[in-house]
Amino acid sequence: MNVKRTKKAEKRVDTSYLSSLGIKAYGHNNLYPQEVKAIIEASPNGSTCVERRATYIEGNGIVSQVLADTVCDFFGATFDDLHHLCSEDMAYFDGFAIHINYNAFGEIVSATHIPFENCRLEEADENGYIRHVVVHPDWSGKTTRNGKAVKVNKDNCDFIDIFNPDRYVVQQQILSAGGVQFYKGQVLYITRSGKNQYCVPIADTVLTEMSGDEAVSNVLCRNVRNNFLPAGVLVTKRGQSSEDDDIGFAEDVAKLQGDMNALKILHIEVENDESKPEFLPFNSKNYDKEFTATTAKFIDNIYARFNQEQFHRLRTGAIGFSGDLANDVKLEYAEQVTRQQRMLTRAYKAVLEHWTPNTLPYNGMEDIKIEPLIKSVTNGTN
């Protein structure tokens, strides 16, 4: 079958124009990053893979410890803090955003992390040029300030210039804003699709599996927490009947549900005088084995998408438990995230090369290279 005859796949992310906000939507409801993160965080295996990916992308931090400990914004955050947050966004979204502030001379004076999910791109002009990154604290409109919801409208959005450290450009932007005190700065917005481009993170292709992973976990949890788990039923002769018998029986049954009430005995009284006390074993329906194959497939696909199959095999003992083998697996994965680390390093370089002179302990590219987790791997401590 050729391409023409195959069933066409749906577009993964809708980027239609939202005229009310002047932006390109990120997803059909403009909440694609938020929904991706929610699905990942609800999936036991998906969140494990992303957290591991973030740890390895962050590595042991940038090489220069002096620079790492230096405050880089007006909120007291250090470069190490900035690197940590950008690494986490890279793990979740394969992109990150940094807010850049300048002085009146067009020199950078601060760099602050912006949550990637808070950023949207302005619609391109007739020349295809995107001029602003649009930032809102919560595109779902649920965040409140002083007890009032922060509505999603232009008044509550910050339209911030795209990163361009050229001193002349910066000074012209400052003049247009009415002075440095009114200037909103710039945003460095980078994804694996390039600068100022929405991207589809690698997690996108296994969102179905991660959603299913959450669902199976819920079923198994309910099986343990809410299932009917008595050890058996004791049948005895009933005495004088009461109007409250039916209500009491229903309450007794409810008390036998869940793990905290497992292995108790349900007592039932019958009206037949000839009935003798009898104990009847009670076997409840267990759903654990119903999803064994499904769960295994979900896990395999999730770990494979994040290139972490060896970690899963190591965890299950499929390839043994030796310390050397574990170190080899960790070392291999540390090498796999070098592409993401280079993206971060290039971004830091673009910022630091235009920083206010003689205010940072930055001496060149070697200072901002990211140290991989090789030392931790060698010591077997990670």
Regions from the PLM with identified roles:
Residues S19, F228-D244, L266-M343, E353, ...:
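Surface-exposed loop-to-helix/strand elements on domain peripheries
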Residues T78, Q308-E309, N358:
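Short coil/loop linkers at secondary-structure junctions
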Residues Y348-H354:
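Long, intrinsically disordered, low-complexity Ser/Thr/Pro-rich regulatory/activation regions
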